[in-house]
Amino acid sequence: MTTEFMLVTLSNQSADARWGEKALLSTGAEGMTIHLTGKDKLGSIQRAARKIDGQGIKNVKLAGDGWDLENSWAFWQGFRGPKGKRSVEWAPLPAAESKELEQRLKIVDWVRDTINMSAEELGPEQLATRAVDLMCDIGCEAVSYRITKGEDLREQNYAGIHTVGRGSDRSPVLLALDFNPTGNPEAPVFACLVGKGITFDTGGYSLKQSAFMDSMKADMGGAATITGALALAAARGLKQRVKLYLCCADNMVSGNAFKLGDIIRYRNGKTVEVMNTDAEGRLVLADGLIDASAQNPQLIIDCATLTGAAKTAVGNDYHALFSFDDALAQELLASAAAEQEPFWRLPLAEFHRSQLPSNFAELNNVAGPAYTAGASTAAAFLSHFVTNYQQGWLHIDCSATYRKGAVDQWSAGATGLGVRALANLLLSKAR
């Protein structure tokens, strides 16, 4: 059976007036034309692709001039959706750009597909296994890994992951993956990447309302994003050793679930009083950050869908960036600009570290009632588990990972945003 493709072309001219003032799309005997008359050409292409998909067109051919790498990618970002199959016959590209497009399609689509999976399909161990499979597909000869789960976590003092995940019938998991393309098992670790992998978040006994719980299959978006970033950096030729830690668990309600007032004792000596079981992401990340710090890398990046406060500040349109290292923060913003991905820096100051008071432990897992900068205090909590937190550490609160509903540029579901910027940063720092 022959597949019929709709031809899609680009034009810098306005559409015929019959299509309406400032029309983005027009249709003719030869196919459809996207009219790029505004300043945001990539955004216009992405919005046009959403409109084309919305008309039920699933097979397209990008024809004519103008379909370079970034324009082609913008089209796919808008055209792709979580339901049904779509196919694109791409315009010819130079070999290097064609390879880059192929890598993005493979890796960023993996991120989007993984985040969109239902919690029934994707538990903590399945998330870890999918990450291993992706990295092995990119460069298996450079990959080794260890999966620690269930009671082994408790016995090895991964107190945060075990505490959060023990209330679920599905065992919590820590994936420690070593990407070492140097061939030298004693090579220094250049960077450590830590991801929050909460595969479903009920909020625990600090129970979420349904309207806030219905998207919590995507609470592992940080783990998927940082895994995708490492995979893309590796595919682009990363030559330095990087370790990846995914802290995976379900946050459920049960007779064995953790409770308000519990004290968690971490391997670095910190004690944490739990006063909100829905602030669980920082509790699992702490274990990964302790391991990351022990490697003494030049760079530590953690990614997490950590707070609603960050999303309130920047919406679903940006990832929120926190760091004490001004130069490093600017490097990430430069990488984000180079890849046309949206990051926005939010405040993180030394005084935020003292806004987590507890009567019974060194730290509270949420800020005191007088301190309302929720995203900043969450980042500050994490800093207590990074040995040299003032240099070489970035925290990404992944607000742009997932959309509950479709908008003019995106279908509902995962976006894959952040993968390219973080891969770019890894490569630029590794040079």
UniProtKB/Swiss-Prot annotation:
Cofactor note: Binds 2 manganese ions per subunit.
Keyword Protease on entry: yes
Example of a GO cellular component annotation carried by this entry: cytoplasm
Role: Probably plays an important role in intracellular peptide degradation.
Molecular function GO terms recorded: manganese ion binding; metalloaminopeptidase activity
SUPFAM superfamilies, A to Z: Zn-dependent exopeptidases
InterPro entries the record matches: Leucine_aapep/pepB, M17_PepB-like_N, Pept_M17_PepB, Peptidase_M17_C
Pfam families according to UniProt: DUF3663, Peptidase_M17
Residues reported to bind Mn(2+) 1: 201, 278, 280
Record keywords: Aminopeptidase, Cytoplasm, Hydrolase, Manganese, Metal-binding, Protease
Gene name of the record: pepB
Catalysed reactions, semicolon-separated: Release of an N-terminal amino acid, Xaa, from a peptide or arylamide. Xaa is preferably Glu or Asp but may be other amino acids, including Leu, Met, His, Cys and Gln
Assembly and interaction partners: Homohexamer.
One GO biological process term: proteolysis
Compartments reported by the entry: Cytoplasm
Name of the protein this chain belongs to: Peptidase B
Classification of source organism: Bacteria, Pseudomonadati, Pseudomonadota, Gammaproteobacteria, Enterobacterales
EC number(s) from the headed UniProt entry: 3.4.11.23
Record-listed Mn(2+) 2 binding positions: 196, 201, 219, 280
Family assignment from sequence similarity: Belongs to the peptidase M17 family.
Cofactors demanded by this protein: Mn(2+)
Active site: 208, 282
